[in-house]
Amino acid sequence: MEHTRSGSDILVRIDPGEEIHTVLKELADDLGFDAAAITSGIGRTRENSYGYMDEEGVYQRRSLDPPSELVSLSGNIARTEKGDAFTHIHCCWSDDDNNVLAGHLFQATVHVVAEIHIRVMDHASMTRCPLAEFELSLIHI
């Protein structure tokens, strides 16, 4: 991973074999920010796990293992109540037949490259707190 920063904007290049959530949490820790918007991301990933939350508040997971084009990625980076970096990301992929798949991102390993733009909110604080009745952590602003 490499990154460059200009004011509140960070452009991150994530390299083959690196996992997106892991790299972005490490970046938040290394740079010391508590609140950021992930505004865009493109690239090619593999071993993708994504899904949606059903009516009962339980995430339903899907796998997309072959390398696929990451056509859109967005979300945010906050902190847990214990101070750990927490990423919340949604993605859209296109498979090799141009079928689009999308949802909440659980895991994605970069296959070729991922290029992600982050906007740090220097004077903001966002904390993720568990919501007991759902498999979810709400953001407190």
Go through the PLM ranges and name each one.
Residues 15-71:
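Short, well-structured hydrophobic secondary-structure segments
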Residues 136:
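C-terminal binding/interaction regions
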Residues 64-105:
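Mid-chain, well-packed structural core segment of small domains
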Residues 16, 93-95, 118-122:
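Short, structured patches in soluble enzyme cores that scaffold and shape functional sites
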Residues 9-11, 35-39, 68-69, 89-90, ...:
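Structural motif
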Residues 1-12:
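Generic N-terminal amphipathic, Lys/Arg-enriched alpha-helix
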Residues 139-141:
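Conserved small/polar residues in nucleotide/adenosyl-binding loops
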Residues 106-120:
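Structural signature of FAD isoalloxazine-binding scaffolds in flavoprotein oxidoreductases
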